[in-house]
From Swiss-Prot:
Species the sequence originates in: Lactococcus lactis subsp. cremoris (strain MG1363)
GO cellular component labels: cytoplasm
Protein known as: Ribosome-recycling factor
Function: Responsible for the release of ribosomes from messenger RNA at the termination of protein biosynthesis. May increase the efficiency of translation by recycling ribosomes from one round of translation to another.
Subcellular location: Cytoplasm
Keyword terms, alphabetized: Cytoplasm, Protein biosynthesis
Length: 185
């Protein structure tokens, strides 16, 4: 029972960190990253379809994304979806592929992105702390129901805290890596 509580908390914290990593990947850092286009939906046969299912996305240069559609007939639809997305990047259509040149970030925009990143980090930490609280509550209920002893409860609380501290450290590590990436010119 006790191990189950810690394992469940640990798995939930891993999901929070994975979500954080996805969110951080969507922050444009002045260099090409295929995950920038993850949220782009193309209307294909009347249904919104993720861009990465309709085209291959490659990075031929440090600041260039190249979108090569599997079906050339949807090139205009992909271009339209990229224009309408909130990426702030103008697509260049050369007839067979679409190139997206990522502009250099201004210092002001870098600072804004760091602030936005801070919000993502804080919400991930809040989620991790909520998971810890849930695990602690479950452990206390188990002790009240006489499923575990008081000593086991203390050990369990310490283990839950250690897992929480590790998850928060990982969130901070992800933040420092992304901040360095954002602020490097």
């Amino acid at each position: 029972m006790a191990n189950e509580i810690v394992t469940t908390a640990q798995e939930r914290m891993k999901h929070s960190l994975a979500s954080l990593q996805r969110d951080l990947g969507h922050l444009r850092a002045g260099r090409a990253n295929a995950s920038l286009l993850d949220r782009v939906q193309v209307v294909y046969y009347g249904a919104p379809t993720p861009l990465n299912q309709l085209a291959s996305i490659t990075i031929p240069e440090a600041r260039v994304l190249m979108v090569t559609p599997f079906d050339k007939s949807i090139l205009k639809d992909i271009e339209k979806a990229l224009y309408e997305s909130d990426l702030g990047i103008t697509p260049a259509n050369d007839g067979s592929v679409i190139r997206l040149v990522i502009p250099m970030l201004t210092e002001e925009r870098r600072r804004e992105l760091v602030k936005e990143m801070g919000k993502y980090i804080e919400s991930a930490k809040v989620a991790i702390r909520n998971i810890r609280r849930d695990a602690m509550d479950t452990a206390k209920k188990s002790e009240k129901a006489k499923e575990i002893t008081e000593d086991d409860l203390k050990d369990l609380e310490n283990e839950i805290q250690k897992v929480t501290d590790d998850a928060v450290k990982e969130a901070d590590r992800l933040a420092s890596v992304k901040e360095k990436e954002l602020l490097d010119i």
